[in-house]
Amino acid sequence: MRIVLVVDMFDEENNGTTMTARRFADMLRQRGHQVRVVSIGESGKDKFGVPEAHYKLVTRISHKQGFCFATPDEKVFRKAFKGADIVHFFLPFPFERKAAKIARQMGIPTSAAFHLQPENITYNIHCEKVELLSVGFYRFAHRYFYKDFNHIHCPSKFIAGELRKNGYKQKLYVISNGVDDEFRPMEVEKVTDPEKFNILMIGRLSYEKKQDILLK
């Protein structure tokens, strides 16, 4: 199949969505599929680059988390989508919304994933106790983007449950993001100091990950 992945960031390995998109592309290629990517960055073989978009206050906050928004470009979308069998989207932002509209105009099937957990946003703006904000985001994302998709990939049962709870009627597919093959069990000597214990934490060092609670 000729599969196009649309995601704001693909080149920088600094967030979970990007890492998932890169693994997804690698695995699909290993299975013989042709994979094209549309994202921020330089163009290259099967890569269609666009510039970064800036949204004033939102961009300043997103940069602190290592995330950048991509600029929608109809010409780039049409070039990347030509001859594609399906276009897959990872996030519900203006870049993806415009791309999805173009794909449908071209008669190409689309699918989407839900990788942006609202709680990640509310924690970073220190509004984690205002539950209505998370509920509002789930419902806004549905109206703004996901309502036009029939199939949504969820990286966890939790996300699938939250989508159902917030009115998503589409077919939901729970598929783990997976782990790279480079991560394998190792035989190492365990530290046996009775006054200490080892902690392994995988993920971003970020407020919503609550590393402070783990350490306490």
Give the positions of each predicted feature.
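Carbohydrate-associated surface elements
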Residues: 41, 158, 178
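Short N-terminal targeting/anchoring amphipathic segment
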Residues: 77-96, 108-113
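Membrane-proximal helix-turn-helix segments that form the acceptor-binding/catalytic region
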Residues: 105, 133-151, 166
